From Swiss-Prot:
One of its GO terms (cellular component) is cytoplasm. This is Arginine--tRNA ligase. It is found in: Cytoplasm. Monomer. The keyword Chloroplast does not apply. One of its GO terms (molecular function) is arginine-tRNA ligase activity. InterPro entries: aa-tRNA-synth_I_CS (IPR001412), Arg-tRNA-ligase (IPR001278), Arg-tRNA-synth_N (IPR005148), Arg-tRNA-synth_N_sf (IPR036695), ArgRS_core (IPR035684), DALR_anticod-bd (IPR008909), Rossmann-like_a/b/a_fold (IPR014729), tRNAsynth_Ia_anticodon-bd (IPR009080). Its EC number is 6.1.1.19. Its main location: cytoplasm. Belongs to the class-I aminoacyl-tRNA synthetase family. SMART domains: Arg_tRNA_synt_N (SM01016), DALR_1 (SM00836).
Amino acid sequence: MDYKNLVAERIKENTELEVDLIEKLIEIPPKKEMGDYAFPCFQLAKTFRKAPNLIAEELKEKINKEGFEKVVTVGPYLNFFVDKTILIKDVLEKVLSEKEKYGSSKVGEGKNVVVEYSSPNIAKPFHIGHLFTTAIGNALYKILSFEGYNCIGINHLGDWGTQFGKLISAYRRWVDEEALEKDAIGELLRIYVKFHGEAEKDPELEKEARLNFKRLEEGSEEETELWNRFKDLSLKEFNKVYDMLGIKFDSLAGESFYSDKMDAVVQEIDDKGLLVDSNGAKVVMLDEYNMPPCMIKKSDGATIYATRDLAAAIYRKKTYDFHKCIYVVGTPQALHFKQVFTTLKLMGHDWADDCKHVGFGLVKLANKKLSTRNGDVVFLEDLLNQSVEETLKIINEKNPNLKNKGDVAKKLGIGAVVFTYLKNNRERDIVFDWKEILSFDGETGPYVEYSYARGKSILRKAGELTGEADYSKLSSKEEFELAKLLGGFNDAIMNAIDKLEPAMVTRYVIEVAKAFNKFYNAHGILNAEDNDVKLARVKLVEATCQVIKNALNLLGIDVVEEM
């Protein structure tokens, strides 16, 4: 039974409000002793022409209380106490029957959502900052798909621009082929940095680089061949990380894909009378929106990121007819996306309102213990490998006889890192501290994983239990609070979708793990006082494990069955 919906239906019977609006207004009381759901009566003051606290009293008398232990007023609020036995039975039966589908819905059926995320630059390091966009984007993709949306995951690769002209010049002069095959990104970065150092002494190098890129734009065979090689070598390195994270994309259409689509966009902007000359550059003026101009073409005629993003948005709308187009890109790019979306609106594309920028913070290191390949960039692959190594050390200390230690360490280590990136509001910076990230205590990935493994251990020891569970035996505060939390899984998911914030699911699963451990510490399960209590508690454990697994899967994290 969906109690939130039941509350809404009961209120609707006595007011003119619609169920959808009532559900949005319903709150969870700040203290458990105040009830399970609260409805603020302020919204009804105009209709009833009475003070909200008087309206609450009237509704309390009229409302159908079936399914609730009691309904009380707290000032202007109407507070509902659910029937604990009915709730526990409804929630556990629903979880155990729906299993891996529990928490899902068809709310997004028939709606396409484009999610652009990860998007590293070709020939540049895939560093720890990239995991923010990669983890958030992957989680949003999974969460939206779980609720019925048809998602299109796009890795908008940074594979175009004048930097490739520079890289071609650097390659021809200084490349070490052996080093390139051994560590492609490291070698490409080395020669790119060398190019900039040499160009300060010899300005002719910059001219040569521009000429290289011009030839690439014109489709020159030699330059195109080198560009493809840089791209292939980079993707080979990137895919190592994506494989570790278990991430796949539906499209790798990067900046180069839109290179032949930009002239049409520039022409469309010009045809709408929006293109203005500014010191030789072409811009769209956005003064009335309190924004600087959106540059469309530089003074040398070259297009820039905004032009490519405009072309990409128009192409995606034509190709996918999206319900939403989500850009998971760092918060510093917020102004850029406001300019792009506003320009789209000025061009007459009202669907620009369906384009959403999902920003995120920075990653900082708590100490310098994480080694770097070139002194300043921390490669993501190295970070993940180090996390696996550190986790294996912990396993060897705590449970040296554990089977499949390597596999467990991989899942736990990588999962711990991803969990850290998704734990708090995405716009908050992350301070990376191994001691905290890999701790089995506190609000960490390993703590949640350990809670799941603890539950699975109980289920293995319990074996096959026969008979129908009598959920009225689950009468304690800890049992009710855990079951009630399990019933709120879909609410957490819908909040994550509403706010485009995976942390809503992460915070939720932390609370489930905490509630489970409170229950575990307060009550005997396998040594319960009688078989009916034992069976009911085992079912509660089984449902908890299912919800934790479903939640972690939505975050892109694998569970471990034993640790």
